[in-house]
Amino acid sequence: MALSQSVPFSATELLLASAIFCLVFWVLKGLRPRVPKGLKSPPEPWGWPLLGHVLTLGKNPHLALSRMSQRYGDVLQIRIGSTPVLVLSRLDTIRQALVRQGDDFKGRPDLYTSTLITDGQSLTFSTDSGPVWAARRRLAQNALNTFSIASDPASSSSCYLEEHVSKEAKALISRLQELMAGPGHFDPYNQVVVSVANVIGAMCFGQHFPESSDEMLSLVKNTHEFVETASSGNPLDFFPILRYLPNPALQRFKAFNQRFLWFLQKTVQEHYQDFDKNSVRDITGALFKHSKKGPRASGNLIPQEKIVNLVNDIFGAGFDTVTTAISWSLMYLVTKPEIQRKIQKELDTVIGRERRPRLSDRPQLPYLEAFILETFRHSSFLPFTIPHSTTRDTTLNGFYIPKKCCVFVNQWQVNHDPELWEDPSEFRPERFLTADGTAINKPLSEKMMLFGMGKRRCIGEVLAKWEIFLFLAILLQQLEFSVPPGVKVDLTPIYGLTMKHARCEHVQARLRFSIN
């Protein structure tokens, strides 16, 4: 009698639960694709029924999957819910998949959160990877290059990007001086994001946004509402029931995407009212002109209604990635003043104090370039590429990978792989310099991974690197950044599509000298 009272379940209930467990197990096993003879499935750690490995991933999936790769290898499989996910680690394996077998791995999985971005029409996130997608990607790449890194015949600057960044960096220095004269401190992210958004706004629309534009400021200062939900491994993409439960983060994500799309639609429409095909001055204008060239049957031309989708991808990626990189750079500099002094010594020696840095100075500033590369590597603020998927049945390192398999590419693991990097947890820009310290060690720099690889490599990679370099060169030439004694700076990354550091509102900037 006492024993029966201590057991909360009856024998019948236990048998029923066991039967259900076995049924679920066999159903899930039956859903697994048949592996062709002579091949094998990737190794898979034990996971919970129905849940898979979602609990194992925790709050930092990039770290959890890096630990798994140490035990199970470069190619492993996990399950999030009932969905199999291939996880790729280590540089050689990732390069084999995304470059040498690029056509096999160029797809995107059909994820719920991706359908909420630009109404599911995003060039970056959509599942499309066919000829029309490839043609539009080339079009976006060409338009971006034309109004960023190409030369501007009407300007003394080397290119449009240099002109826009120089103007915005000068305005940012003035704004930081005003803040130092007032409150005496500032949050660098909130200040940098406005300047970076103005640069991409000038390239996309030929205009800078006024500081009084509350609409624009609200969007660019709240990108965390996007990156926290668009991250790899979000349970929303793998457990459909979660979409119908109260979820403040999902509601913020939906609202942000709707506001952002509406803002861009309105801006593009206003731009169209003034469009002159004989005077194309920005990316949107170039897309308008291309849309009017003739029939679209080949897929090489883009309908006007699709232009906003391309602009959304270019604008969105153009300010978040660059802002995050510059913000991380400033956080490293205030915690490592000796590195800041080395950069400023290099700037003083190469450029002096009579003019501002230019993009042409980049080869003569190897230590600054090494610092930027080390910031990319150490923070790995893009821990995963946007998820890939396989476009057909394929093999990788002897493992069978079925068509439409979701693929996570762990960039953080590559950037912290002890086989590639000596003391990977240490922040040391010198690792990227040649032995004599006069140039970048190019073979090593090419092992750092932040912008993806292959057919889905970020189209704005060159633009981002040039922009980050020029912003930092101009800022560090004229300003010295610090935090007051006793203020602790938290450099722990906060997981998301792009990982941010904890906000720091106590950064200070002292003017070294001014340039008219």
Curated annotation (Swiss-Prot):
Q: For this UniProt record, give its keywords in alphabetical order, as a comma-separated list.
A: Endoplasmic reticulum, Fatty acid metabolism, Glycoprotein, Heme, Iron, Lipid metabolism, Lyase, Membrane, Metal-binding, Microsome, Monooxygenase, Oxidoreductase, Steroid metabolism, Sterol metabolism
- Induction of synthesis: By nicotine, omeprazole, phenobarbital, primidone and rifampicin.
Ranges in coiled-coil conformation: none
Variant or mutagenesis effect after changing S212C: In allele CYP1A2*12
Q: Name one GO molecular function term.
A: electron transfer activity
Q: Which reaction does it catalyse?
A: an organic molecule + reduced [NADPH--hemoprotein reductase] + O2 = an alcohol + oxidized [NADPH--hemoprotein reductase] + H2O + H(+); 17beta-estradiol + reduced [NADPH--hemoprotein reductase] + O2 = 2-hydroxy-17beta-estradiol + oxidized [NADPH--hemoprotein reductase] + H2O + H(+); 17beta-estradiol + reduced [NADPH--hemoprotein reductase] + O2 = 4-hydroxy-17beta-estradiol + oxidized [NADPH--hemoprotein reductase] + H2O + H(+); estrone + reduced [NADPH--hemoprotein reductase] + O2 = 2-hydroxyestrone + oxidized [NADPH--hemoprotein reductase] + H2O + H(+)
What does the entry list under GO cellular component? endoplasmic reticulum membrane; intracellular membrane-bounded organelle
Which GO biological process annotations does it have? aflatoxin metabolic process; alkaloid metabolic process; cellular respiration; cellular response to cadmium ion; cholesterol metabolic process; dibenzo-p-dioxin metabolic process; epoxygenase P450 pathway; estrogen metabolic process
Would I find Protein biosynthesis among this entry's keywords?
Answer: no
Superkingdom, according to UniProt? Eukaryota
Effect after changing R377Q: In allele CYP1A2*16
In the record, the effect of T83M is given as: In allele CYP1A2*9
Localization recorded for this chain is: Endoplasmic reticulum membrane; Microsome membrane
Q: What InterPro entries does UniProt report for this protein, alphabetically?
A: Cyt_P450 (IPR001128), Cyt_P450_CS (IPR017972), Cyt_P450_E_grp-I (IPR002401), Cyt_P450_E_grp-I_CYP1 (IPR008066), Cyt_P450_sf (IPR036396)
Glycosylation site list: S69
| Membrane topology, as annotated | Peripheral membrane protein
Q: How does it assemble?
A: Interacts with PGRMC1; the interaction requires PGRMC1 homodimerization.
Outline what the protein does.
A cytochrome P450 monooxygenase involved in the metabolism of various endogenous substrates, including fatty acids, steroid hormones and vitamins. Mechanistically, uses molecular oxygen inserting one oxygen atom into a substrate, and reducing the second into a water molecule, with two electrons provided by NADPH via cytochrome P450 reductase (NADPH--hemoprotein reductase). Catalyzes the hydroxylation of carbon-hydrogen bonds. Exhibits high catalytic activity for the formation of hydroxyestrogens from estrone (E1) and 17beta-estradiol (E2), namely 2-hydroxy E1 and E2.
Q: Which named protein is this? A: Cytochrome P450 1A2
| Annotated organism of origin | Homo sapiens
* Source species taxonomy: Eukaryota, Metazoa, Chordata, Craniata, Vertebrata
